[in-house]
Design a protein with these regions (language model features):
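Nucleic-acid enzyme cleavage-core boundary/entry regions
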Residues: 1-231, 246-368
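Acidic beta-strand-to-loop metal/phosphate-binding motif
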Residues: 228-242
């Protein structure tokens, strides 16, 4: 690896204990110890790009998604094969009479019945063994807990703070002070904590004269109780089943209110190369309901009903900023009931198709 201080190419022996043997200065990460792609220069480079060279601040969660070296997701697989009990329950009643017939017969009949009995037993013994079903899952390398540990322990102990422009959004992090908004003109309803911290720390709601409301999708209706009904609502959510249903259900509950869906659309990530795909452990949502309520295509509804989802926090920060800005401006000029299911998706990029029938796998920024 390359020393982040003197740029010397270091062998394993020249970087023992995360200290450069040439300049004798410590560094935080070593790919050999902390995993592929985990080195100071790469983390700094990705953080600089994410913050637009210092113009924006980003969260540790956003940096984690951007610095991942691998992500993959797989759907559930049904059980297949025959249970041993069933195999022998069928085979023994057939094989036993044949063995008896062979034992008490002579000549050709004994040979044929004996061979048939052996064939039945052999088929039962060699039949495909039952493989239990497997639930879907996903994998991101490094894991979020591991990445946070590296940032909190190794990086802070080496440099005294997180990379420039990166803020902690963990559960123990202090709350971010939000710039005051005198008379808000709109509401931004955000269901992702990392994205809400990103918006607050960059003063985006105040700049747009919007009130930021953070809530889980299931609690979104209650979170809007204290918000004046005249204010338009811009909804930010993951590309998930609950996220896709949120804006349509809010429109039904508040027919006199502008509700603009600016969440991450499934069409932008389902077949997009490089998008992060994850699998939820929550009970599946019926595909028919997703089509009827959210107006999704058959393919998108099936993808979500299989448990797949994609996090809003994985969207590049500059793209996220531009989408939120455009969505609030659009909501301010819209009329109640005039927005359809596709409105709010106009600023999101279309997905780049991937070969059908393959496991969802994406790689993060180059690990070099």
């Amino acid at each position: 690896m390359t020393c982040p201080h003197c740029a010397a190419a270091l062998t394993a022996r020249e970087r023992t204990g995360q200290v450069c043997a040439h300049c004798e200065r410590p560094f935080a990460l070593d790919p050999k110890s902390h995993g592929r792609g985990m080195n100071d220069l790469r983390i700094r480079r990705i953080a600089a790009a994410a913050t637009d060279d210092g113009r924006l601040k980003v969260t540790v969660t956003q940096l984690w998604y951007l610095t991942r070296t691998y992500s993959g997701a797989w759907g559930p697989t049904p059980a297949h094969g025959i249970r041993p009990f069933v195999r022998w329950l069928l085979a023994l009643p057939l094989a036993l009479p044949l063995f008896l017939w062979s034992a008490f017969s002579d000549g050709l009949w004994a040979t044929l019945t004996g061979a048939a009995a052996l064939a039945v037993v052999g088929t039962a013994a060699l039949a495909k063994r039952r493989t239990p079903g497997r639930s879907g899952g996903s994998l991101i390398t490094p894991a979020e807990s591991r990445f946070r540990q590296l940032m909190d322990d190794r990086w802070r102990s080496t440099y005294g703070r997180l990379p420039p422009g990166v803020v902690d959004d963990g559960p123990r992090a202090p709350a971010v002070r939000e710039s005051p908004v005198g008379r808000p003109a709109a509401v931004i309803l955000c269901t992702d904590h990392a994205v809400a911290v990103f918006l607050r720390v960059n003063g985006i709601p105040a700049r747009l004269r919007a009130r930021l409301v953070e809530a889980e999708p299931a609690a979104a209706h209650e979170a809007l109780v204290d918000v004046p009904g005249r204010l338009p609502v811009v909804v930010l959510h993951d590309a998930s089943a609950l996220g896709a249903l949120l804006a349509p259900l809010l429109r039904l509950a508040h027919p006199d209110r502008v509700v603009l869906d600016a969440g991450l659309p499934v069409t932008a990530v389902r077949n997009r190369r490089g998008a992060v795909h994850r699998v939820s452990a929550a009970p599946p949502v019926d595909a028919d309901g997703l089509r009827a309520v959210a107006g999704l295509s058959d393919e998108d509804a099936a993808w979500l009903s299989d448990g797949y989802w994609s996090p809003l926090a994985a969207v590049p920060p500059s793209r996220l900023e531009s989408v939120v800005t455009a969505a609030v401006k659009r909501a301010l000029t819209a009329r109640p009931g005039a927005l359809g299911a596709a409105d709010g998706f106009l600023t999101w990029p279309a997905g780049e198709p991937t070969p059908a029938g393959t496991t969802s796998r994406t790689k993060g920024a180059p690990a070099g």
